[in-house]
């Protein structure tokens, strides 16, 4: 697999590739497809803020002054206590939104909140020691100016009580301030108190009230988002944090981290549910075919139909040749339960079952079968290679290399071994070592096309452009009917922004696919051409049409599905794009792939909901591609 990318110009190319690790194959392609245009939704979960208007210059009432003096005397009892009090300058600063509490800080504060909650537990919210200064009756007789003046002073007392962690008193002060004036700041500050004692339902009520008065109040959005998350209402939390970020002008990096965390939590929840309800299934036929094509065809073993294991395996091989992979898998599993004419035939059964498990995303399950195959026939190299790929899938590089070394000690003449070892080195960025192994593979069998193609790609990655071009020109002469040669060569030309030549090669690859592959056609030349015309001519309509052709050729091609979603998103067709992202999640092999797909689906869903709920923000959304 090439997966050529150019870090300097930010462009990348998707290739169909043939890689020993199927998961790595999918992950690398998905990474590109999604990065051509991630949905621009960013947000943050806000922390606790204290807001402060300018201190009123008027004279305080005697009764209020007595309570304020009492609060101030507590502040002055000691330097340590004074340090806890929230200063007016800090309150004013927090109003600007610069004191955004990060997700990490929120997590760290969670433990403190539990302690604080214990302290307040004995004293209910209504058990404050605050006298009722502002009541519904008393404020009726006040002028507008008097109510505003009293509200501001009550808020000041609330801020001080909050700073001293006297949350019941702070709630009472803010409640009385609200009695004087329905100011969104008072509701948001009271919500901060409820958050401190863990009453998240009340946080949502107060912040919702604040937002009904001021829909662009960022701190209220942040507080409500945090409360929603605490209650497990992740979709609502994601919406609030997204809107908050847009109002805040995407200025804070923690907002991006927060929305990513929320997206991941939502995606993990949905992935977990889908994995529980979805029965194990094989990936698309083209996916399986691509993997199988990365190995030389093995000669069939000599079957003895007197043994039921042999007979079932013979049928499994017949289905395999026809591309009827589910039937082949079923027969292979049936074969495992039977008797065999020889350990060698039995080894082939385990190898085939392990292969189907591996391409289905069950790397750990496949290891049992591959190990069984090796134990039954230690000279059979293919299960060694596939076992190493399973370890690579599980990020166990130490065991992967041990298996590859064991295979080499058994047989130094197996071309597949060096090809797949080269692939491991290639994806690790060890291009010089990969080139050496590709050359070993070619020296052992120069008829295997993928060793030649990948050699050319590896040479290109080391900036040996002339050598790479020569390798591909030689490939075109030696394998004139191979669509893969023209597809990969087109990718390299596209990476050099030689658009016209790249498209010509993709077109030739498409024609060869139509002519040579009547049953399972590769969609990759069509997808690559779509990317080319988009980069070259910005022709989004043609790019979409090419993706639709790719899906017609291979309806379950995950790369085509993800590409289609992105091109639709680019055109503002978010609802249709969402359908493709969700389909991508349904087709995902592994949980990590599923989480990735659901993350983009949820980002798109949030964008749709946001444009409906906050139409005034549509113009402030970043271009999705």
Swiss-Prot record:
Gene3D superfamilies: Tetratricopeptide repeat domain. One of its GO terms (molecular function) is mitochondrion targeting sequence binding. It is found in: Mitochondrion outer membrane. The chain crosses the membrane at residues 32-51. It is a single-pass membrane protein. Residues 56-97 are annotated as: Disordered. Residues 1-31 are mitochondrial intermembrane. Residues 66-97 have a biased composition (Basic and acidic residues). GO terms for cellular component: mitochondrial outer membrane; mitochondrial outer membrane translocase complex; mitochondrion. The modification Phosphoserine is found at residues 128-129. Residues 52-625 are cytoplasmic. SMART domains: TPR (SM00028). Keywords: Membrane, Mitochondrion, Mitochondrion outer membrane, Phosphoprotein, Repeat, TPR repeat, Transmembrane, Transmembrane helix. TPR repeats lie at residues 151-183, 184-217, 219-251, 347-380, 415-448, 450-482, 483-516, 524-557, 558-591. Disruption phenotype: Abnormal mitophagy during nitrogen starvation. Residues 56-65 have a biased composition (Basic residues). GO terms for biological process: protein import into mitochondrial matrix; protein insertion into mitochondrial inner membrane. Belongs to the Tom70 family. Component of the TOM (translocase of outer membrane) receptor complex responsible for the recognition and translocation of cytosolically synthesized mitochondrial preproteins. Together with tom20 and tom22 functions as the transit peptide receptor at the surface of the mitochondrion outer membrane and facilitates the movement of preproteins into the tom40 translocation pore. This is Probable mitochondrial import receptor subunit tom70. It comes from Schizosaccharomyces pombe (strain 972 / ATCC 24843) (Fission yeast). The lineage of its organism: Eukaryota, Fungi, Dikarya, Ascomycota, Taphrinomycotina.
């Amino acid at each position: 697999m090439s997966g050529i990318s150019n870090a300097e110009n930010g462009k990348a190319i998707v290739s169909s590739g043939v890689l020993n690790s199927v998961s790595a194959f999918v992950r690398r392609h998905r990474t590109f497809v999604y990065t051509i245009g991630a949905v621009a939704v960013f947000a943050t979960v806000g922390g606790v803020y204290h807001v402060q208007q300018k201190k009123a210059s008027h004279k305080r009432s005697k009764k209020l002054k007595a309570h304020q003096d009492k609060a101030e005397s507590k502040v002055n009892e000691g330097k340590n206590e004074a340090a806890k009090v929230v200063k007016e300058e800090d309150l004013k600063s927090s109003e600007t939104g610069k004191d955004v509490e990060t997700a990490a800080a929120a997590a760290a504060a969670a433990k403190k909140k539990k302690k604080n909650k214990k302290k307040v537990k004995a004293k209910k919210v209504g058990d404050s020691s605050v006298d009722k200064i502002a009541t519904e009756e008393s404020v009726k007789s006040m002028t507008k100016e008097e109510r505003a003046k009293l509200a501001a002073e009550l808020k000041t007392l609330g801020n001080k009580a909050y700073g001293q962690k006297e949350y019941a008193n702070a709630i009472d002060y803010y409640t009385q301030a609200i009695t004087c004036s329905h100011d969104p700041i008072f509701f948001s500050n009271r919500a901060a108190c409820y958050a401190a004692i863990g009453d998240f339902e009340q946080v949502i009520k107060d912040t919702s009230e604040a937002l009904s008065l001021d829909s662009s109040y960022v701190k209220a959005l942040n507080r409500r988002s945090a409360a929603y998350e605490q209650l497990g209402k992740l979709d609502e939390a994601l919406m609030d944090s997204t809107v908050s970020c847009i109002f805040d002008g995407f200025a804070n990096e923690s907002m991006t981290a927060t929305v990513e965390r929320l997206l991941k939590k939502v995606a993990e929840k949905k992935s977990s549910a889908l994995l529980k309800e979805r029965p194990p299934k094989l990936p698309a036929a083209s996916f399986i075919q691509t993997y199988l094509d990365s190995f030389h065809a093995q000669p069939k073993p000599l079957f003895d139909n007197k043994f039921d294991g042999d007979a079932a395996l013979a049928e499994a091989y017949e289905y395999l040749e026809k591309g009827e992979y589910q039937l082949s898998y079923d027969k292979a599993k049936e074969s495992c339960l039977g008797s065999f004419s020889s350990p060698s035939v039995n080894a082939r059964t385990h190898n085939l079952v392990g292969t189907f498990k591996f391409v289905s995303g069950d790397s750990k399950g496949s290891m049992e079968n591959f190990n069984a195959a090796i134990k039954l026939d230690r000279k059979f190299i293919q299960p060694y290679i596939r076992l190493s790929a399973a370890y690579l899938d599980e990020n166990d590089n130490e065991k992967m290399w041990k298996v590859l070394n064991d295979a080499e000690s058994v047989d130094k003449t197996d071309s597949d071994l060096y090809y797949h070892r080269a692939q491991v080195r290639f994806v690790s960025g060890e291009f010089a070592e990969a080139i050496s192994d590709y050359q070993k593979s070619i020296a052992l069998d120069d008829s295997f096309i993928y060793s030649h193609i990948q050699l050319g790609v590896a040479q290109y990655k080391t900036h040996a452009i002339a050598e790479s071009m020569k390798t591909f020109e030689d490939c075109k002469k030696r394998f004139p009917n191979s669509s893969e040669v023209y597809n990969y060569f087109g990718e390299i030309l596209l990476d050099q922004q030689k658009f016209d030549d790249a498209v010509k090669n993709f077109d030739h690859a498409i024609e060869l696919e139509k002519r040579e592959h009547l049953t399972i056609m590769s969609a990759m030349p069509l997808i690559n051409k779509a990317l080319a015309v988009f980069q070259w001519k910005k022709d989004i309509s043609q790019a979409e049409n090419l993706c639709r052709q790719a899906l017609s050729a291979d309806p379950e091609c995950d790369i085509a599905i993800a590409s289609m979603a992105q091109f639709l998103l680019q055109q503002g067709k978010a609802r249709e794009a969402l359908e493709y992202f969700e389909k991508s999640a349904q087709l995902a092999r592994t949980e990590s792939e599923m989480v990735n797909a659901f993350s983009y689906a949820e980002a798109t869903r949030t964008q749709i909901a946001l444009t409906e709920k906050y139409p005034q923000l549509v113009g402030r959304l970043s271009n999705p591609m």
